[in-house]
């Protein structure tokens, strides 16, 4: 009797592989529009806008009804549960609108971080209970990929072995459950930029974390060709006094991936991690221009770095919708170019060089 069991049928593997590859098609990346109700409330507070369901719906409509040209640069959108079931003011479901434009709808399925006992202020992520049923429902409702975020912190004692092991296994369990239900899992082990650590420390920790993740994915029989990785770019801590160039960041990031990420993985979609819009775009561009071996597509899955200027231009006012859409489209184009190593010049956006860092950031 063979000890190897086919955990997914050939048809399901083909669908997962094709959708994962479509997400990282050349010149395209993801819009992360999966902020929780609480998190988007903080963004709205900055423009003195009340955090109501209608305002959240109107803002997401602004993004999704931008000139269809945005679909040349955005392959998919990560949605929050509420958004999956919202509609345009004309009554068209957002999921249907996105699919008509050739944009894959995705869904955030984790339920947030919780303290991890036996550690020094570390955490794990909850949401595995009834995940299979939720994934099946989201697939039926039109979603084709999912995202799950785990968080690790750098300090004199962290990340601990326990935190790396626990979060890697949580990500792997999530990934397998997603694949069983037809969703491409985006695996997000975020090493937070909080702290004063240097670039070398950030690289070493990122390599450790990714090593744990890919060991766990193998242990859980996850089909790598039907997954994507969403890691942090390797940068020094926010409070580090030493300055590094985008080329330094690119080298550290690519080396970390080379040492840990199997070539079977079709793509890496970086989170922006509180960088300014300009810094995130420049770093992505430098990563793609770096001359080392890069067997994966290297693209973006940005939230704040694709939206900050759009919100600032919109201000919650209907007459500013076109201005907000213009900002979003400009950022989508810039990052599409950066994912090919072809971004040049500056970003002339409302929040271009403004840091978007939030300490101990939670979605």
Swiss-Prot record:
Active site (catalytic residues): 188, 230
Pathway the protein contributes to: Carbohydrate degradation; glycolysis; D-glyceraldehyde 3-phosphate and glycerone phosphate from D-glucose: step 4/4
Protein name: Fructose-bisphosphate aldolase
Keyword set, alphabetical order: Glycolysis, Lyase, Schiff base
Reaction(s) the record says it catalyses: beta-D-fructose 1,6-bisphosphate = D-glyceraldehyde 3-phosphate + dihydroxyacetone phosphate
Marked site: Necessary for preference for fructose 1,6-bisphosphate over fructose 1-phosphate: 363
Protein family: Belongs to the class I fructose-bisphosphate aldolase family.
Gene3D superfamilies referenced in this protein's UniProt entry, alphabetically: Aldolase class I
Keyword Lyase: yes
Residue sites binding substrate per the record: 56, 147
Matching PANTHER family: FRUCTOSE-BISPHOSPHATE ALDOLASE (PTHR11627)
Root EC class: lyase
Protein source organism: Echinococcus multilocularis
A Gene Ontology BP annotation from the UniProt entry: glycolytic process
């Amino acid at each position: 009797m063979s000890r190897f069991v086919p955990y997914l049928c050939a048809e399901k593997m083909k669908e997962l592989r094709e959708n994962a590859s479509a997400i990282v098609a050349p010149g395209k990346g993801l819009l992360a529009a999966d902020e929780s109700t609480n998190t988007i409330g903080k963004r709205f507070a900055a423009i003195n806008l009340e955090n109501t369901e209608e305002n959240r719906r109107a803002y997401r409509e602004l993004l999704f009804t931008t000139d269809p040209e945005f679909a040349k640069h955005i392959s998919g959108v990560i949605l929050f549960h509420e958004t999956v079931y919202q509609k345009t003011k004309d009554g068209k479901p957002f999921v249907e609108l996105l699919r008509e434009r050739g944009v894959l709808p995705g869904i955030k399925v984790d339920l947030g971080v919780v303290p991890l006992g036996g550690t020094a202020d570390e955490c794990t992520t909850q949401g595995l209970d009834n995940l299979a049923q939720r994934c099946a429902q989201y697939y039926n409702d039109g979603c084709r990929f999912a995202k799950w975020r785990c968080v690790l912190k750098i300090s004199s004692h962290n990340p601990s072995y326990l935190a790396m092991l626990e979060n890697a296994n949580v990500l792997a369990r999530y990934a397998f459950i997603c694949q069983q239900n037809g969703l491409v899992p985006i695996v997000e082990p975020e090493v937070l930029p909080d702290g004063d650590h240097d670039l070398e420390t950030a690289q070493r920790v990122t390599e450790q974390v990714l090593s744990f993740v890919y060991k766990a994915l193998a242990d859980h029989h996850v089909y790598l060709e039907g997954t994507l990785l969403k890691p942090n770019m390797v940068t020094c801590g926010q409070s580090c006094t030493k300055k590094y160039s985008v080329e330094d960041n690119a080298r550290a990031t690519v080396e970390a991936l080379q040492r840990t990420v199997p070539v079977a993985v079709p793509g890496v979609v970086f989170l922006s991690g509180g960088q300014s819009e300009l810094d995130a775009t420049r770093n992505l561009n430098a990563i793609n221009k770096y001359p080392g071996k890069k067997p994966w597509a290297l693209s973006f899955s940005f939230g704040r770095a694709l939206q900050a200027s759009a919100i600032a231009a919109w201000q919650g006012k209907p007459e500013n919708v076109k201005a907000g859409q213009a900002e979003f489209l400009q950022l989508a184009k810039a990052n599409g170019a950066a994912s090919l190593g072809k971004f040049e010049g500056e970003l002339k956006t409302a929040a271009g060089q403004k840091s978007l860092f939030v300490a101990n950031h939670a979605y």
